[in-house]
Amino acid sequence: MTSLTQNRYFQKLQDWHRDNSADINLRSLFDADPERFNNFSLNLNTTHGHILVDYSKNLVNKEVMQMLVDLARSRGVETMRDNMFSGVKINYTEDRAVLHVALRNRSNSPIVVDSRDVMPEVNRVLEKMRSFCQRVRSGEWKGYSGKPITDIVNIGIGGSDLGPLMVTEALKPYASGGPRIWFVSNIDGTHIAKTLANLTPESSLFIVASKTFTTQETITNAETAKEWFLGASRDPSTVAKHFIALSTNTSKVKEFGIDPQNMFEFWDWVGGRYSLWSAIGLSIALHIGFDNFEQLLSGAHWMDQHFRKTPLEKNAPVLLALLGIWYINFYGCETHALLPYDQYMHRFAAYFQQGDMESNGKSITRSGTRVDHHTGPIVWGEPGTNGQHAFYQLIHQGTKMIPCDFLIPVQTQHPIRKGLHHKILLANFLAQTEALMKGKSNEEAKKELQAAGKSPEDLEKLLPHKVFEGNRPTNSIVFTKLTPFILGALIALYEHKIFVQGVIWDINSFDQWGVELGKQLAKNIEPELDGSAPVTSHDSSTNGLIKFIKQQRDIRIE
């Protein structure tokens, strides 16, 4: 594939940006086009409510959007999309298909990898998950003392933690009748210790999520949990009633003491950060019930079908991806804020930090050459309105442009005080995107200060600080209610956005070699931390840090 910067549509966009970007003004665009909202928004009518994607408050016009769509087409987005859904091994560095879409393929149409339809295997594991969830949630599955399970602990890291954690938090209102859920990921002993302190061994069930069953953090935490558990049960045979494996390594699972009957498998065509749809989502299904888990899958499948069948010009994941390309590759933006105005979605941005940054934090193209353009952004964010009292100052008046996605449900799960809280939340959501778009002109700020009775001297001093440039781009994503179906659709929306950007940048969004080097070095350093002998095998900084740690670790601090 030709370098992105040599692509003629990319160059047309560069020329347009050079000649026009200084003059594009959102206020003027809205004033000039009364239909701008209708022309630059999508109303997705799902079978479980609507998702409105309003992208009218972006620094684009119809000409720019058409050039961006032409760029996507010329970069092979449609072909790569079809290849992914068809089981082609588009993860070329690992020679793997990319088929998280198969896990939620509710239409059950065949998806073939290596001449074999994967859907029978997918359905078999889903049925096993359904049966297991029913047994645990009904109380039929008993612990070693005959008590039902009250607490589930998911032990995993990365994709085996972030997705299930985000979804179980987002869907708490649907967890009625389910066990409590806990997540342990960090190798820091504080995480497992503080979790175990809340639990009773005889009614706790541990899910150990590791494809290879060799992930250091996960297995170390699982062994600690087993040691704690056996301290109470004093019978190794009871491990089978309290530990479940999500893995493909049967021998390691048996070695740990888990009955292979209690092992739920998944496949190498499921990437970790796309795995919540697989057996890795068992903790989700146990918490909210399998029927609701299926609704999550159905919502994602709905978005898959929209992404696969809708022309690029009206395709929500594609349009969000192209707007990101516009800001990253032409405006030089380095970050993207995800700002959900729903407390249940408080882990949404953290989840897509991995989803986006591990996928598109790459600098080498499919042909093995270094890119000559920017790729994945830094993704961050917090729920509204908390963020308004923390970092919105920089978004409004800082020196960096930060494109933002604002997300909110029209209906709240908790309409307390006759909906007052949610009305205030909605008002703040709407006000922020309008304020970022419009800003406050010098004249408007001056009139405001005069109306407040400021003296000429105070007015002159305060005026520059009260001006807001505006022209800050945002997307507004408004949905009827945060249900399992809608959450599934929203997650898939962003997954496909990330995929489209990776195709345009000509990088592999489905490997993660960048996480390996640090892990390799940590294995070498770990034995060097034993004893008191000085270490000289590293650079002076690392040697000095090791020396300091050895000096300080036995000092008694009250």
UniProtKB/Swiss-Prot annotation:
Major location, coarse class? cytoplasm
Question: What is the designated name of this protein?
Answer: Glucose-6-phosphate isomerase
**Residues found modified as Phosphoserine:** 86, 107, 185, 455
Modification(s) after translation: Phosphorylation at Ser-185 by CK2 has been shown to decrease enzymatic activity and may contribute to secretion by a non-classical secretory pathway. ISGylated.
N6-malonyllysine modified-residue sites = 454
Q: What is the protein's quaternary organization?
A: Homodimer; in the catalytically active form. Monomer in the secreted form.
Q: Which GO terms describe its biological process?
A: canonical glycolysis; erythrocyte homeostasis; fructose 6-phosphate metabolic process; gluconeogenesis; glucose 6-phosphate metabolic process; glucose homeostasis; in utero embryonic development; mesoderm formation
The chemistry this enzyme catalyses reads: alpha-D-glucose 6-phosphate = beta-D-fructose 6-phosphate
Name of the coding gene = GPI
